[in-house]
Amino acid sequence: MGDEALRRRLGRLDRKRRRQKSKVDSEPAPPGRGLPPGEEIDTPFGPAFLIQNQYPMDYKHGRNRLADILEFDTSIAAEVARQPSLGETSIERLVFIDTETTGLVGGAGTIAFMIGIGVFRDDAFVLRQYFLRDPGEERGMLTALQGDLESAEGFVSYNGRAFDLPLLEMRYMLGLRHQWSLSTWPQFDLLHPARRLWRMSLPDCTLGTIEKMQLDVHRTEEDVPGSLIPGLYLDYLRSGDASQMARIVYHNEVDILTLVGLATQILNRHQYQDSSELSGSEALAVARWHQEVGRLDAAEDAFLRAIKSSKPDVRVDALHRYTAYLKSQDRRDEAIEKWQTLHSLSPDDPRPCIELSKYFEWHANDLAQAQQWAQEALVCLSHWEDGWRRDQVWGEIEHRLGRLARKAGDG
């Protein structure tokens, strides 16, 4: 069912319920049959339903204990996430957050019917999941959540900056008339670091794929695909039968535990002193990170690991970036062999040939070699389809050859 159709059905259901009850905020429908055990919390805006679990610090989720993440300083997270403000807090002050919603694309008609948060507290990891038993309880749920976040200083999420937190901001505005800029808080959004590390080695970078292939997390049959969750919740609202809600609770619970494990793995990769322990794609991502923050020796070490990758696409990307790095350091002599390797790996790419032509013209003063590599660049370009980009590059190379011919003639 599309998100728009789901919103319309949810809206019709909500309007029907409001007609049937004049005090929906203070007198919500009782929990449905089969709802997981939890407690009802009283707030000034009505009740909220909370499911809470506590995990010992040595609890192992996949490859890591929950406590492992506490070994890292947030200064690393600040660099990885490009969020300097993260370095001013601590892991213990961050909230691991994930929501389950009535739609997968956001918008004013989308409601977060489950909000899960995890925090480190008193030598344990405390997981609190707020479940919306009835749409009329949303104000109570948001009020209770607000109390939980009063002592927080930032978030850890997976695409929370773009989805979960803007959605919650909207719900606070619509439900409580409260403008709360949650998306401006310090955030360690794991989506982008995960993509940088593994987009070239995994079939996709969904949380489910990453947790299985990088964290060794395997969910039980109790789990439910995320795409089915909005429909299951709508069925619950229509029927009152909450027997499937335990699967959603489990899904959200594992998501949050995975956030802890994934953050640990990402920070671990970026703190490795020896790049030989990294895969090629990981080394390339780490090299770029070190280069961005000015740790050039560490960047070079990681680049050298990445160019040894067994994956051709990783190796080619690494060679392009490493030769650009060598050029920026005025170490072109060291780049010659790498450009030649790039040409052999990507015979349709004229860029390595053009760089070699430039080198031999301007730095080695070998016009014959410069002409040879410019001609080779045209051979590469001849494999391209006709188009403006091909014509543009072809013209640039011919201009180069013309200049080289004049230089050779003058000589």
Across the structure, where does each feature detected by a protein language model lie?
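N-terminal accessory regions of nucleic-acid-interacting proteins
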Residues: M1-I91, V286
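Conserved DEDDh/DEDDy metal-dependent 3′-5′ exonuclease domain
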Residues: D122-V217
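Acidic, Mg2+-coordinating catalytic module of metal-dependent nucleases/exonucleases
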Residues: R196, L202-E277
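Structural register within alpha-helical repeat arrays
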Residues: V286, R321-Y322, L356, A370, ...
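Residue at a conserved register position within TPR or TPR-like alpha-solenoid repeats
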Residues: H290, L326, F360-E361, A405
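Short coil turns that delineate tetratricopeptide repeat
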Residues: K311-D313, P347, S382
